[in-house]
């Protein structure tokens, strides 16, 4: 377990592309962020989360996921997480309805959901760019951007009409996030990717979103 920011720890990288599984915590409450599949011989996200919660004496209150791609969301992982943490509520963007096999007890949201961890706000914002179910997770001034490609509105899925999000939707997602700080009176100043491959401090978040709204060729 690797602490990245106060209350935000990377439990490990799992699945075949090193998807991060995270623990968000405040006081004695926690949320598990990301529900990737376990692969033979690799770290198991459920065991990682259970060990961390036991070690820190935390009650897991929420189960979260940034988007519904196969390396980030697994039905068996969700089932096992719910069995391991029976009091935890899965809170997922409405687009997950088509991939969750047991929706009973799952809270689905459309645009934005405000949660609470031990008195600290936790925001889930639907902002499709990399995928149609993209959920940006904001906690303790840090935003997990999932698999968002930053500083350009382009995505790695632009070649595939079945996967790519319409450009106008991506632009609106960037603008929605630009408005977030003003509308919520909340300072976002840290950014990290769910794979744990990107970590930024002292970020001007609205400016970063304005850059991400532009059409730039970065690869």
Model regions: which residues?
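Residue-level detector of beta-strand face positions
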Residues: 23, 114-116, 123, 136
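Hydrophobic/aromatic beta-strand patches that form the interior of the parallel beta-sheet core
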Residues: 9, 64, 91, 107, ...
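Conserved beta-strand hairpin/beta-sheet module of binuclear metal-dependent hydrolase folds
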Residues: 1-51, 135-152
């Amino acid at each position: 377990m690797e602490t990245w920011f106060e209350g935000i720890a990377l439990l490990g990288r799992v699945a075949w592309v090193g998807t991060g599984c995270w623990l968000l915590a405040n006081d004695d409450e926690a949320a598990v962020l990301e529900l990737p599949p376990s692969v033979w011989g690799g770290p198991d996200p459920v065991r990682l989360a259970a060990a961390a919660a036991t070690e820190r004496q935390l009650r897991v209150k929420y189960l979260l996921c940034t988007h519904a791609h196969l390396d980030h969301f697994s039905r068996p992982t969700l089932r096992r997480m719910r069995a391991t943490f029976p009091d935890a509520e899965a809170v997922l963007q409405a687009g997950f309805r088509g991939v969750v096999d047991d929706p009973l007890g799952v809270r689905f949201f459309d645009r934005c959901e405000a949660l609470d961890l031990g008195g600290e706000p936790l925001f889930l914002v639907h902002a499709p760019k990399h995928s149609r179910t993209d959920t940006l997770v904001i906690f303790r001034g840090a935003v997990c951007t999932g698999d968002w490609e930053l500083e350009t509105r382009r995505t790695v899925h632009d070649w595939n009409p079945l996967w790519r999000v319409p450009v106008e939707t991506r632009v609106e997602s960037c603008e929605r996030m630009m408005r977030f700080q003003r509308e919520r009176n909340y300072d976002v100043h840290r950014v990290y990717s769910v794979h744990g491959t990107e970590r930024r401090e002292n970020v001007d978040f609205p400016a970063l979103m304005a850059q991400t709204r532009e059409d730039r060729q970065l690869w």
